[in-house]
């Protein structure tokens, strides 16, 4: 259903690690047992035409002063590595070496930005990020389907290139309806608990 909705809207979509594992049948080393369960369930549910569409998604998209990847910009696959406190500096260095000011990424499912301002670098999680004084940044808009920030709302961000602002948003949705559906399809309790806890 999600794939069909994306196809209808003709959005720019990039390939993630689960997409790659689903279409190749090869999960990455870090896939947990429940992650593998989801892959097996997805393989039984997703039709061939939809798998073909996923297989043809680009691993990244680069435009103007930004790049979008699922994982980390310095990872050759663009969808397996994480941007987090132990890797953000080398990923910021990668952006500097390639003259890319902004990288939008996912994979961590944690909304926020690692930045380089002058010689200062760090992480911030604010409602709005002004880009005018930032040299390079790694922006995670969060996760619509499985946030891991301790909040259960669906997360997203809006990038206004003209105003040089990224606005971060959260929106409520019927979580219990999703949980009921997961129970119906026999999803592991661990995944249901994770969704309820926003972890």
Give names to the regions the model predicted.
Residues 116-199:
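Acidic, His/Gly-rich catalytic cores of divalent-metal-dependent hydrolytic chemistry
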Residues 45-115, 199:
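His/acidic metal-ligating clusters that form di-metal
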Residues 1-3, 80-81, 115-118, 152:
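Short amphipathic alpha-helical segments
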Residues 13-17, 69, 102-107, 138-142:
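Active-site neighborhood of phospho(di)ester-bond hydrolases with catalytic His/Asp-centered motifs
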Residues 1-51:
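Core catalytic region of metal-dependent phosphoesterases/phosphodiesterases
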Residues 21-25, 75-79, 177-179:
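A short acidic, helix-capping loop that chelates divalent metal ions and anchors anionic groups
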Residues 18-19, 72-74, 107-111, 144-145, ...:
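Catalytic metal-binding/acid-base residues of hydrolase active sites
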